[in-house]
Regions:
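Hydrophobic anchor at the start of a short beta-strand
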Residues: 8-11, 72, 111-113
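Extracytoplasmic/secreted proteins, especially bacterial periplasmic and envelope-associated proteins
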Residues: 21-25, 45, 97-100, 131, ...
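A structural motif corresponding to the C-terminal end of an alpha-helix
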Residues: 4-6, 42-44, 101-112
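Primarily recognizes the serine-hydrolase "nucleophile elbow" in alpha/beta-hydrolase
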Residues: 1-68
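Gram-negative outer-membrane beta-barrel domains
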Residues: 4, 16-18, 81, 97, ...
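C-terminal catalytic histidine-bearing segment of alpha/beta-hydrolase fold enzymes
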Residues: 106-179
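Conserved alpha/beta-hydrolase "acid-adjacent" motif
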Residues: 81-97, 125
């Protein structure tokens, strides 16, 4: 960071789909002092996280945050068949999606911006990069740069749109990604 003149306290991690899963896992590992983050400089923290259709996979029934996470912006469609929107648990493991994470952040009084799109599929892994730049700019300006202690939730619904399937099994999530 020093060599390139980068202020490491202003790094925002962003990812889409598997990349969103990666950045969310990175922040979760930092918050829980996981051995996976030992190679990072002492005290390193992200300034913010932007996740387009991401989730956290955890060997346990709940996510447990040992410290307050960076401000997060979470985009997700509630009919995503690739990455869970809310949570799916099976055999003592959980796959925790954006809705679930947003609920935890609200309970923790941690700054976040959750943008939920009704009846939207995994298209939310890419669409907001074009369609929601103003919302992303607002998140970066208010929650990251100005450090405003805000919890923002936006629910986008298309009037008259037909309902689509929203309940998927773990096997269906796996099949949609690997088969």
């Amino acid at each position: 960071a020093d060599e390139w003149g980068i202020d490491s306290s202003q790094i925002v991690a962003c990812g889409s789909s598997a990349g969103a899963i990666t950045v969310l896992h990175g922040e979760y590992a930092l918050c829980n002092a996981s051995p996976l983050v030992q190679h990072l400089p002492a005290g390193f923290r992200y300034a913010g996280i932007v996740s387009f259709a991401g989730a956290i996979f955890e060997m346990g029934e709940e996510l447990v945050w040992a410290s307050q996470p960076a401000p997060m912006m979470l985009f997700h469609g509630d009919a995503d068949a690739n990455v869970p929107y809310n949570v799916i648990r099976e055999s003592g493991v959980g796959f925790f999606g954006s809705k679930y994470i947003a609920g935890q952040l609200r309970t923790m009084n941690s700054p976040y911006y959750f943008y939920s799109v009704e009846n939207a599929s995994h298209v939310i892994a890419t669409a907001p990069m074009d369609d929601n730049r103003d919302a992303i700019d607002a998140f970066l300006s208010k929650l990251v740069v100005d450090k405003e202690p805000l919890m923002i939730e936006t629910d986008e619904t298309t009037i008259g749109a037909p309902e689509v399937r929203k309940d998927f099994t773990l096997a269906e999530y796996i099949a949609s990604n690997f088969m």
